[in-house]
């Protein structure tokens, strides 16, 4: 007989004026820009704390101290230089 899509296309779907007004909301994997703006400061703070902790715990490694920490302007030459006194040097 007749296809159901032909019969239904004659009558538009009823849309109540009191119902919700749906709009497209942009997102990336379900994270909207509003959520991203709310989460970013917290994520940045935790990232900074984690970076500080890694550098603090790894500051005893001579290679990291020499290649990374001593190259920090103003701080590197004052705080991260490890000078061993001649009396403690076994050679």
UniProtKB/Swiss-Prot annotation:
Keywords: Electron transport, Membrane, Mitochondrion, Mitochondrion inner membrane, Respiratory chain, Transmembrane, Transmembrane helix, Transport. One of its GO terms (cellular component) is mitochondrial inner membrane. GO terms for biological process: mitochondrial electron transport, ubiquinol to cytochrome c. It is found in: Mitochondrion inner membrane. Residues 1-34 are mitochondrial matrix. Belongs to the UQCR11/QCR10 family. This is Cytochrome b-c1 complex subunit 10, mitochondrial. It comes from Neurospora crassa (strain ATCC 24698 / 74-OR23-1A / CBS 708.71 / DSM 1257 / FGSC 987).
């Amino acid at each position: 007989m007749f296809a159901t899509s032909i019969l239904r296309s004659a009558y538009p779907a009823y849309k109540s004026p009191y119902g919700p007004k749906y709009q497209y909301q942009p997102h990336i994997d379900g994270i909207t820009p509003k959520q991203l703006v709310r989460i970013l400061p917290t994520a940045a703070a935790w990232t900074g704390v984690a970076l500080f902790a890694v550098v603090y715990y790894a500051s005893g490694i001579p290679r990291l101290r020499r290649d990374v920490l001593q190259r920090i302007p103003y701080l590197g030459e004052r705080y991260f230089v490890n000078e061993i006194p001649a009396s403690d040097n076994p050679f």
